[in-house]
C-alpha cells in the first residue's frame, strides 16, 4: 500500500521537493478533535511540520463550512493580485513599526456622506449561500405570487385605505419605491470611490455638514502639521490647569510647605549617576537636574534602549524648557498668593463689618445709658434740693418712696447698678429717723410696718436675701433697719419686764416678716434671752404667785431651742421645791403639767422618777387594805398622777407596794369561811379603780388573773365549800366573764386600729392630691394631739423649720431631721412621735 497521501500539501498536491515523512505520533489537533465524529481530515503541510503551532494557516483550511467538505466553486470570479513594485526592506520595516501606532487622519480623507454598503463576499461563497433560509434572492418580484392567487392581500390593503402608487400610512408618508442599491465602481473598500449614496437617499435624508464639526476636524489636522522626528505619530497630549485647580492646590500645599523636622534632617545617598552624591534632605533631590553625565562617551549615551534601531532624538532645548517651567511655576505661585491675599481681604471686610455692628450697638447702648443717667441725676438733685432746711416744699417719706419707685420702674438697670446705700443714707435715713421719733413699740406694735415693707422692696439687695450674716455695706435696707429701727427697739427692751411678755411677743410677731433674719436673731439672742435668763435665776417656785410657764411658754414659737439653757435651772429649782412635797398637795401637778410637752421625754421621765415616783411609792406603801373599812385617799393621790408619770412607772409602783398586800388580804379572807359574793364585789370594785391603759398592761393582767386562780382553788377545796351553795359556779362564771372581757378588749383595740387605718386609706383615696411626707407628719400629729406648725421666718439651708411639739424639725427629700446639740440628726417618724410625747 502506497503512503503517498501522507506527503500531500494543503491542496492535495504531492510535495516533490522534500522527502520528509509524517510522523505517526499523536498531535494536539488529534487530542482536541478526539470526540468529534464529523471532523475533517487535516493533512499536515510542510510549513506546519516545520513551525508547528507557529505556522501560518490558510483561512480556507482552518475554517470548514457547515456542510462538511466544500467543493471548489468554479463559477466564482477569478481573483487577481495586482502586480507592482516590491517595496524595500526599509520601507516594509517602517510600515511594520507604524502598524501599532495611531494613524493621523486628515479632513479630506473623510467622505462627505455615507450610503448603503454592499456586503463584500469572498469568491468561495456560492450564490445559493448569500440568502437566509426561507428567504428569496431578490426583492424585484415582491408580490408576484398574487398572480396565482385571488389577491386577498391587495384587497385588504385597499379596504384599509391604501392607494396604489402612494406610500403607506395615514398621511401616505411611507416610501413608494423600494430601496435602491448602487454598484461600486471597483473592488476597493467602502468610500474608496467617493460617496455611494443614491439619489433617493439624498432626497429622503439630506445631510448638512456642521460648521462646528468641520472646524473641530480642521483644528485636529492643524495640530498634526509637525512630524515627530522619532517616528512616533501619536498626538501630543496637553494638560491645562484652571485657576480653581491652582487655588485648591495652593490651599492643600499650604499645609505641606513646611517640611517635617525629621525628614528635613535625613541623609540621602544618590547612587543613580556615575558618581555617588550625598543630599541632606529629600527636598534637595527635587532640585537635581536630569542631564546626562559628562564622563560617559557619546556612543554609550546613544545606545538604543531596546533591540530595535535607535531613533533620532527629538528637537529639545532643556534650557528653554526649564525657563518655561520656571515661568509657569512663578505664575502659579502668583495666582495662589493673590488668591490668599484676596481671601484675607474678604475676611478682613467681614470682620470689620461685624466690629462695626458691635460698635454701633455699644454706641446706642451708651447713648441710652447717658440719657437715663441724666434723668436719674435730675431726680437725685431734686431730692437733694428739697432736703435743705430752708426749702419751702420739704421732701416727705411718702414722696421719697414714690421717687424711688419711679427709679426702680423706669430706670431699673441704672438703679440696680447705682450705689443705693449712699443714696439711701443721704436721703431716706433722715426722713426715717424723723418718722420713728415718737414711736413706742410696746404700745403700738404695728406702727411703721407698711412703710418699712415698701422700703424693703425698694432697697433690699436681691443677692442678699438668703444671706445669713449682716452685710451693712452692701444692702441699704439692712443698714436702714440696723441704724434707724434697732435703736428704738434697744431702748424699749431695756425698760421691758420679762414677766410681762405679751406686749413684747406681739411686737416681734408683727415685725418678724419684715425685718431681716439676722436682726431678729440679734434681738432674741442679745436682748430677750439675757432678760429671761436673769428673771429665771430670780424666780422662786415656793414664793412666786405667778407660774413660770405663763411668761416662758409664750416665747416658744419665736425662740424654740434658744430656751433650752433655761430648762435646767428651772428643773433644779422645781426639784428643790419638791423635797418636802407630799402627794396630798395637788399644786405640784398644776405647776409641772405645762412642762410635760416642753421638756424632752428623757429629761421629763428622769425628773418624775427622781422627784415624784418615790413620793408616790411612799404614799402607796402607807395604804392599808381593809375589806370591811377601806380608806381610798392615798390610792387616789397616786392614781391622779397617771397622766404625768409613765405607765411603766405606775405599774412598777403597783407591783411593789399594792398587789402584794392586796393578794395577801384576799388569801386571808378566803381562808376564814368567806362570803363569795362579797369577795366578788370586792374584786370587781378594785379592778374598776384602774384605767383601761393600766389594766391592759401584762403585769396588771397577771396579778388579777392570779387573784382569780386563788379564788377558784379556794372554791374547789372542800373546806368551806359546803357552807355556801352555788359559790363554785359563781366564781367560775366570774372567771369566764373576766377572761372574755379581756379578750373583747383586745379585739376591740385591734378593730379600732383597723378602722383608723381604713379611714386614713379612704381619706387618701378620696383626696385628689397625693399625700406627701409633710402631710403624713401632720396626720400623725393630729392623731397624737401634738402641735405641728411652721416656724415663722426660720430656715435651715433653705428648708422651712417646723415645731413638732417641743422639737424643731425640717424635712428634706422625705427625711425628717431633728435639731441636736451641735447638728441636725435624721430620725424615723415613730422616734419623732416618742420624742414629742
Swiss-Prot record:
<feature type="region of interest" description="Disordered">
    <location>
        <begin position="1"/>
        <end position="21"/>
    </location>
</feature>
<feature type="compositionally biased region" description="Basic and acidic residues">
    <location>
        <begin position="1"/>
        <end position="13"/>
    </location>
</feature>
<feature type="modified residue" description="Phosphoserine">
    <location>
        <position position="59"/>
    </location>
</feature>
<dbReference type="GO" id="GO:0003676">
    <property type="term" value="F:nucleic acid binding"/>
</dbReference>
<dbReference type="GO" id="GO:0000390">
    <property type="term" value="P:spliceosomal complex disassembly"/>
</dbReference>
<keyword id="KW-0507">mRNA processing</keyword>
<feature type="domain" description="G-patch">
    <location>
        <begin position="149"/>
        <end position="195"/>
    </location>
</feature>
<feature type="compositionally biased region" description="Basic and acidic residues">
    <location>
        <begin position="53"/>
        <end position="64"/>
    </location>
</feature>
<protein>
    <recommendedName>
        <fullName>Tuftelin-interacting protein 11</fullName>
    </recommendedName>
</protein>
<comment type="subunit">
    <text>Identified in the spliceosome C complex. Found in the Intron Large (IL) complex, a post-mRNA release spliceosomal complex containing the excised intron, U2, U5 and U6 snRNPs, and splicing factors. Interacts with TUFT1. Interacts with DHX15; indicative for a recruitment of DHX15 to the IL complex. Interacts with GCFC2.</text>
</comment>
<feature type="compositionally biased region" description="Acidic residues">
    <location>
        <begin position="91"/>
        <end position="102"/>
    </location>
</feature>
<dbReference type="InterPro" id="IPR022783">
    <property type="entry name" value="GCFC_dom"/>
</dbReference>
<feature type="region of interest" description="Disordered">
    <location>
        <begin position="53"/>
        <end position="72"/>
    </location>
</feature>
<dbReference type="Pfam" id="PF12457">
    <property type="entry name" value="TIP_N"/>
</dbReference>
<dbReference type="InterPro" id="IPR000467">
    <property type="entry name" value="G_patch_dom"/>
</dbReference>
<keyword id="KW-0963">Cytoplasm</keyword>
<dbReference type="GO" id="GO:0031214">
    <property type="term" value="P:biomineral tissue development"/>
</dbReference>
<feature type="region of interest" description="Required for nuclear speckle localization">
    <location>
        <begin position="710"/>
        <end position="734"/>
    </location>
</feature>
<dbReference type="InterPro" id="IPR024933">
    <property type="entry name" value="TFP11"/>
</dbReference>
<dbReference type="GO" id="GO:0071008">
    <property type="term" value="C:U2-type post-mRNA release spliceosomal complex"/>
</dbReference>
<feature type="region of interest" description="Disordered">
    <location>
        <begin position="85"/>
        <end position="133"/>
    </location>
</feature>
<dbReference type="GO" id="GO:0005737">
    <property type="term" value="C:cytoplasm"/>
</dbReference>
<dbReference type="InterPro" id="IPR022159">
    <property type="entry name" value="STIP/TFIP11_N"/>
</dbReference>
<keyword id="KW-0539">Nucleus</keyword>
<dbReference type="Pfam" id="PF01585">
    <property type="entry name" value="G-patch"/>
</dbReference>
<feature type="region of interest" description="Required for interaction with DHX15">
    <location>
        <begin position="1"/>
        <end position="50"/>
    </location>
</feature>
<feature type="short sequence motif" description="Nuclear localization signal">
    <location>
        <begin position="700"/>
        <end position="705"/>
    </location>
</feature>
<feature type="compositionally biased region" description="Basic and acidic residues">
    <location>
        <begin position="217"/>
        <end position="231"/>
    </location>
</feature>
<feature type="modified residue" description="Phosphoserine">
    <location>
        <position position="2"/>
    </location>
</feature>
<feature type="compositionally biased region" description="Basic and acidic residues">
    <location>
        <begin position="103"/>
        <end position="116"/>
    </location>
</feature>
<feature type="region of interest" description="Disordered">
    <location>
        <begin position="179"/>
        <end position="236"/>
    </location>
</feature>
<dbReference type="Pfam" id="PF07842">
    <property type="entry name" value="GCFC"/>
</dbReference>
<keyword id="KW-0508">mRNA splicing</keyword>
<comment type="function">
    <text>Involved in pre-mRNA splicing, specifically in spliceosome disassembly during late-stage splicing events. Intron turnover seems to proceed through reactions in two lariat-intron associated complexes termed Intron Large (IL) and Intron Small (IS). In cooperation with DHX15 seems to mediate the transition of the U2, U5 and U6 snRNP-containing IL complex to the snRNP-free IS complex leading to efficient debranching and turnover of excised introns. May play a role in the differentiation of ameloblasts and odontoblasts or in the forming of the enamel extracellular matrix.</text>
</comment>
<keyword id="KW-0597">Phosphoprotein</keyword>
<feature type="modified residue" description="Phosphoserine">
    <location>
        <position position="144"/>
    </location>
</feature>
<dbReference type="InterPro" id="IPR045211">
    <property type="entry name" value="TFP11/STIP/Ntr1"/>
</dbReference>
<feature type="modified residue" description="Phosphoserine">
    <location>
        <position position="98"/>
    </location>
</feature>
<keyword id="KW-0747">Spliceosome</keyword>
<keyword id="KW-0091">Biomineralization</keyword>
<comment type="similarity">
    <text>Belongs to the TFP11/STIP family.</text>
</comment>
<dbReference type="GO" id="GO:0005681">
    <property type="term" value="C:spliceosomal complex"/>
</dbReference>
Amino acid at each position: 500500500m502506497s503512503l503517498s497521501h501522507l506527503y500531500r500539501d494543503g491542496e492535495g498536491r504531492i510535495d516533490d521537493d522534500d522527502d520528509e515523512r509524517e510522523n505517526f505520533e499523536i498531535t494536539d489537533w488529534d487530542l482536541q478533535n478526539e470526540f468529534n465524529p464529523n471532523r475533517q481530515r487535516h493533512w499536515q503541510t510542510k510549513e506546519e511540520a516545520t513551525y508547528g503551532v507557529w505556522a501560518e494557516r490558510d483561512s480556507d483550511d482552518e475554517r470548514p463550512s457547515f456542510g462538511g467538505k466544500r467543493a471548489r466553486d468554479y463559477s466564482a470570479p477569478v481573483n487577481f493580485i495586482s502586480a507592482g513594485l516590491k517595496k524595500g526592506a526599509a520601507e516594509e520595516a517602517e510600515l511594520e513599526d507604524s502598524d501599532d501606532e495611531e494613524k493621523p487622519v486628515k479632513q479630506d480623507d473623510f467622505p462627505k456622506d455615507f450610503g448603503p454598503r454592499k456586503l463584500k463576499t469572498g469568491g468561495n461563497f456560492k450564490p445559493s449561500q448569500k440568502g437566509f433560509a426561507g428567504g428569496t434572492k431578490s426583492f424585484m418580484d415582491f408580490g408576484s405570487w398574487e398572480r396565482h392567487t385571488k389577491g386577498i392581500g391587495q384587497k385588504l390593503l385597499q379596504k384599509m385605505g391604501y392607494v396604489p402608487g402612494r406610500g403607506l400610512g395615514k398621511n401616505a408618508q411611507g416610501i413608494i419605491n423600494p430601496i435602491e442599491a448602487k454598484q461600486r465602481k471597483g473592488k476597493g473598500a467602502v468610500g474608496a470611490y467617493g460617496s455611494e449614496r443614491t439619489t433617493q437617499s439624498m432626497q429622503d435624508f439630506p445631510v448638512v455638514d456642521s460648521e462646528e464639526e468641520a472646524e473641530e476636524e480642521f483644528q485636529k489636522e492643524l495640530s498634526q502639521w509637525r512630524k515627530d522626528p522619532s517616528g512616533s505619530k501619536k498626538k501630543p497630549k496637553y494638560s491645562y490647569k484652571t485657576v480653581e485647580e491652582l487655588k485648591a492646590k495652593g490651599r492643600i500645599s499650604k499645609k505641606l510647605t513646611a517640611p517635617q523636622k525629621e525628614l528635613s534632617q535625613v541623609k540621602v545617598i544618590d547612587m543613580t549617576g556615575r558618581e555617588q552624591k550625598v543630599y541632606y534632605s529629600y527636598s534637595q533631590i527635587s532640585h537635581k537636574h536630569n542631564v546626562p553625565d559628562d564622563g560617559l562617551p557619546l556612543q554609550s549615551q546613544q545606545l538604543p534602549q531596546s533591540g530595535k534601531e535607535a531613533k533620532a532624538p527629538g528637537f529639545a532645548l532643556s534650557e528653554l524648557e526649564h525657563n518655561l517651567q520656571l515661568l509657569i511655576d512663578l505664575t502659579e505661585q502668583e495666582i495662589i498668593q493673590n488668591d490668599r491675599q484676596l481671601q484675607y481681604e474678604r475676611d478682613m471686610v467681614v470682620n470689620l463689618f461685624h466690629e462695626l455692628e458691635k460698635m454701633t450697638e455699644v454706641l446706642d447702648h451708651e447713648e441710652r445709658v447717658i440719657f437715663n443717667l441724666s434723668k436719674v441725676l435730675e431726680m437725685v438733685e431734686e431730692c437733694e434740693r428739697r432736703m435743705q432746711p430752708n426749702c419751702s416744699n420739704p421732701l416727705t417719706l411718702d414722696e421719697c418712696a414714690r421717687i424711688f419707685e419711679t427709679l426702680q420702674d423706669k430706670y431699673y438697670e441704672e438703679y440696680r447698678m447705682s450705689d443705693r446705700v449712699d443714696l439711701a443714707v443721704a436721703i431716706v435715713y433722715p426722713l426715717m429717723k424723723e418718722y420713728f421719733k415718737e414711736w413706742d413699740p410696746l404700745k403700738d406694735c404695728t406702727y411703721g410696718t407698711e412703710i418699712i415693707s415698701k422700703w424693703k422692696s425698694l432697697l433690699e439687695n436681691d443677692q442678699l436675701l438668703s444671706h445669713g450674716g449682716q452685710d451693712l455695706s452692701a444692702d441699704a435696707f439692712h443698714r436702714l433697719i440696723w441704724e434707724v429701727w434697732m435703736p428704738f427697739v434697744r431702748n424699749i427692751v431695756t425698760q421691758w419686764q420679762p414677766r410681762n411678755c405679751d406686749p413684747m411677743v406681739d411686737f416681734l410677731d408683727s415685725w418678724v416678716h419684715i425685718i431681716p433674719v439676722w436682726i431678729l436673731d440679734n434681738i432674741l439672742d442679745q436682748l430677750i434671752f439675757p432678760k429671761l435668763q436673769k428673771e429665771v435665776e430670780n424666780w422662786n417656785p415656793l414664793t412666786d404667785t405667778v407660774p413660770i410657764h405663763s411668761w416662758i411658754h409664750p416665747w416658744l414659737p419665736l425662740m424654740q431651742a434658744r430656751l433650752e439653757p433655761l430648762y435646767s435651772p428651772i428643773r433644779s429649782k422645781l426639784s428643790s421645791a419638791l423635797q418636802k412635797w407630799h402627794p396630798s398637795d395637788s399644786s405640784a401637778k398644776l405647776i409641772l403639767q405645762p412642762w410635760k410637752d416642753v421638756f424632752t421625754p428623757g429629761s421629763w421621765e428622769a425628773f418624775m422618777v427622781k422627784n415624784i415616783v418615790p413620793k408616790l411609792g411612799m404614799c402607796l406603801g402607807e395604804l392599808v387594805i381593809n375589806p370591811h373599812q377601806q380608806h381610798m385617799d392615798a390610792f387616789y393621790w397616786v392614781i391622779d398622777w397617771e397622766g404625768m408619770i409613765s405607765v411603766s412607772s405606775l405599774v412598777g409602783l403597783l407591783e411593789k407596794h399594792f398587789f402584794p398586800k392586796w393578794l395577801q388580804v384576799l388569801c386571808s379572807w378566803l381562808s376564814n369561811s368567806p362570803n363569795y359574793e362579797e369577795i366578788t364585789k370586792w374584786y370587781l370594785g378594785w379592778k374598776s379603780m384602774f384605767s383601761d391603759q393600766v389594766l391592759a398592761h401584762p403585769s396588771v393582767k397577771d396579778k388579777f388573773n392570779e387573784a382569780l386562780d386563788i379564788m377558784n382553788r379556794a372554791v374547789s377545796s372542800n373546806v368551806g365549800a359546803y357552807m355556801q351553795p352555788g359559790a363554785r359556779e359563781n366564781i367560775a362564771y366570774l372567771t369566764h366573764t373576766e377572761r372574755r372581757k379581756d379578750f373583747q378588749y383586745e379585739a376591740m383595740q385591734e378593730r379600732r386600729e383597723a378602722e383608723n387605718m381604713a379611714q386614713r386609706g379612704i381619706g387618701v383615696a378620696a383626696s385628689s392630691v397625693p399625700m406627701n411626707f409633710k402631710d403624713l407628719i401632720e396626720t400623725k400629729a393630729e392623731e397624737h394631739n401634738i402641735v405641728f406648725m411652721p416656724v415663722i421666718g426660720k430656715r435651715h439651708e433653705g428648708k422651712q423649720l417646723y415645731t413638732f411639739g417641743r422639737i424643731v424639725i425640717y424635712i428634706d427629700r422625705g427625711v425628717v431631721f431633728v435639731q441636736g446639740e451641735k447638728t441636725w440628726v435624721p430620725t424615723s417618724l415613730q422616734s419623732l412621735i416618742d420624742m414629742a410625747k
